[in-house]
């Protein structure tokens, strides 16, 4: 008879940002453990609130499945003597499998042992598994408490472990499991008996705990939208904020608060940021899209004394907005252009000067990038001015207090200073994209400023030997690299980043004898990120390996070639790979110096020379035209001629001059085919 398992870990308040990952881990870990134990089940559900992690496994079998295995032993000629008696080899093999010699079977000239392992009761499997679920979870930060060696994301206060109605003994950090949980910290009972897994969700709901995070999220969203509609307003919606609030409450109740209209004189960002990022409030806008002097938030509790909670939230926000108003008024006393001197007081990175130094590097790097990509003159003028002002908002009180507003306030202040909208937008766009899925810069100047700022950050950090390893990436270099690549993938710039990296190293005064190693490290870092981008698009590994074997490719070329390679189905062309590999084996150590056409004697070698020259011209023309389908098609056109050449011509001729010339010919054909990369990667 199938059973249901309930396992709840009760703890001090768990950080909201940790919860989705923890619940995902818990489910995956339980699935793995049960599958490894061959214990069938119907479904696994995980639940989470600030104070608890819960797992419910439905339809758990009474015992694990019986396991039948067939083990191959030595050959029958070794296992038995001429009279058919078992030898030591057979006896030892049988003993090792827990069988008698008589249980062995002979098949295809070998002996086999067939064993069966009885199923293990589910209670025994679960008893061993549950402590492993606790210790198997990984957290961004763990903690110890008391004088215990145990560690967890937060101190564990209670455990519930039930297989149907039977308590499964589990101990962790001196806490013993039972069938008693706790309700809402202020509204529910301190001790609540859980009968079984089926009653868990409803029993907690009776004690002001909505343990199902999906139902809780849906309720919060409905409450917020209903309340906004009642105010004839719309919410400045944020899914991430909803997710955070969802894991901050066990019994959600939405409320609406307000603030004085005078604060609306501040830039919208100066109001929205304190609301969302600091207080976890949802701003409201009217039918005209303009901010209203109201906000929505969610209380972890009932509507009892809701007006007191509302007043408290209003008071806290008012203090935040007073700060913002003060900083804004102080900041406006000095335009951005007059704040450049302040950049000398802000350190960029240890040993790499200050932000004034960085600004000078960006001005020069922007000119290099502009030349490489053929930036329009108007955009170049915008880029120059935006770069001069790019970091000046970091000296303002507003950005010092609300660091999330870097670039945002730069744009606001630039507009108030009378700078052009294009300059202001580029100042904002330098930080895009700020996170996965964020918008990319849309203006030409903004794209360039974003790229060169990130390149300077990456090369500077690498030059200090601070290369990200494992999960450690304190300077967010992976995110910045992916940002650069996504900007380039979405642009029309067909440029290589290598000249930009080299210029950056020069501007950072990297020693000449260190530059090649640093360049290789940075390019490898970018290549891996680009590979991951293509893997996320489900591009096959071998196609990516072919593509990225060509270090000279621009990101735009890589994008075009990926699409062309997939459309061409080049990875299915076995003859192409074979011909390419054969040439590689012949000329991998041969340096190309040129083919002497006067030494070509055989028709097949003359034909190959003509075909290779023609293919080379076609490839170059296709590259220049951006016709990636034509570029990808070129290597296959050489295959019949190459095969005929190898069939009719002896490359390693006795005449050294002819031999050397034929190797040069093969090298030429190989080079033409390699224009898209190392085709042998398609093996």
Q: PLM features: residue spans?
A:
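Amphipathic alpha-helical "coupling" segments that flank catalytic cores
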Residues: 1-683
């Amino acid at each position: 008879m199938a059973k249901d398992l309930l396992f709840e870990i009760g703890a001090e308040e768990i950080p909201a940002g940790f919860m989705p990952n923890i619940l995902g881990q818990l489910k995956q870990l339980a699935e793995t453990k049960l599958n490894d134990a061959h214990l069938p089940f119907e479904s696994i559900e995980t639940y989470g609130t600030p104070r608890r992690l819960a797992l419910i496994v439905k339809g758990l079998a009474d015992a694990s499945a019986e396991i039948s295995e067939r083990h191959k032993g030595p050959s029958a000629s070794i296992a038995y003597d001429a009279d058919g008696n078992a030898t030591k080899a057979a006896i030892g093999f049988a003993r090792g499998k827990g069988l008698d010699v008589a249980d062995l079977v002979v098949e295809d000239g070998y002996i086999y042992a067939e064993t069966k392992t009885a199923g293990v009761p589910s209670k025994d499997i679960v008893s061993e598994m549950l402590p492993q679920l606790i210790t198997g979870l990984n957290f961004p930060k763990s903690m110890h408490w008391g004088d215990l060696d145990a560690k967890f994301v937060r101190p564990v206060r209670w455990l519930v472990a039930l297989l149907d109605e039977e308590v499964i003994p589990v101990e962790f950090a001196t806490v013993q499991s039972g069938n008693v949980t706790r309700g809402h910290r202020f509204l529910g009972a301190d001790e609540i008996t859980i009968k079984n897994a089926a009653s868990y969700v409803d029993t907690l709901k009776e004690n002001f705990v909505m343990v199902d995070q999906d139902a809780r999220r849906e309720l919060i969203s409905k409450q917020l939208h209903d309340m906004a509609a009642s105010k004839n307003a719309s919410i400045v919606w944020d899914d991430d904020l909803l997710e955070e609030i969802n894991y901050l409450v066990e019994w959600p109740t939405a409320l609406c608060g307000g603030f004085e209209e005078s604060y609306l004189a501040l830039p919208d960002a100066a109001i929205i940021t304190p609301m969302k990022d600091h207080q976890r409030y949802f701003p409201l806008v009217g039918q005209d899209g303009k901010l209203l002097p109201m906000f929505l938030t969610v209380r972890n509790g009932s509507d009892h004394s809701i007006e007191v909670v509302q007043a408290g939230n209003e008071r806290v926000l008012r203090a935040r907005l007073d700060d913002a108003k003060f900083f804004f008024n102080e900041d406006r006393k000095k335009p951005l252009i007059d704040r450049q001197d302040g950049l000398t007081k802000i350190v960029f990175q240890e040993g790499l000067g200050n932000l004034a130094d960085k600004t000078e590097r960006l001005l020069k790097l922007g000119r290099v990038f502009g030349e490489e990509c053929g930036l329009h003159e108007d955009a170049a003028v915008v880029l120059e001015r935006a770069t001069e002002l790019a970091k000046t908002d970091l000296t303002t009180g507003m950005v010092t207090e609300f660091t999330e507003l870097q670039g945002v306030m730069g744009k606001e202040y630039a507009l108030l200073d009378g700078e052009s909208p294009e300059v202001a937008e580029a100042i904002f766009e330098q930080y895009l994209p700020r996170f996965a899925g964020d918008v990319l810069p849309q203006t030409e100047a903004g794209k360039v400023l974003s790229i060169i700022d990130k390149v300077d950050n990456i090369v500077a950090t690498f030059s200090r030997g601070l290369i990200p390893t494992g999960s450690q990436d304190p300077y967010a270099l992976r995110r910045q690299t992916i940002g650069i690549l996504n900007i380039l993938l979405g642009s029309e710039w067909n440029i290589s980043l290598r000249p930009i990296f080299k210029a950056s190293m020069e501007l950072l005064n990297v020693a000449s004898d260190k530059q090649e190693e640093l360049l290789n490290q940075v390019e490898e870092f970018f290549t891996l990120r680009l590979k991951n981008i293509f893997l996320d698009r489900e591009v096959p590994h071998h196609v990516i390996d072919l593509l990225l074997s060509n270090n000279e490719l621009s990101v735009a070329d890589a994008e075009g070639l990926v699409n062309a390679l997939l459309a061409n189905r080049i990875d299915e062309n076995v003859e192409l790979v074979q011909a390419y590999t054969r040439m590689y084996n012949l000329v991998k150590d041969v340096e190309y110096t040129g083919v002497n056409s006067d030494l070509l004697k055989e028709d097949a070698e003359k034909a190959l020379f003509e075909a290779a020259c023609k293919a080379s011209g076609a490839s170059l023309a296709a590259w220049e035209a951006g016709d990636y389908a034509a570029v990808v098609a070129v290597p296959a056109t050489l295959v019949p001629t190459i095969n005929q050449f190898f069939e009719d011509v002896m490359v390693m001729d006795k005449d050294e001059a002819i031999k050397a010339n034929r190797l040069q010919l093969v090298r030429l054909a190989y080079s033409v085919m390699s224009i898209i990369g190392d085709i042998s990667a398609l093996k």
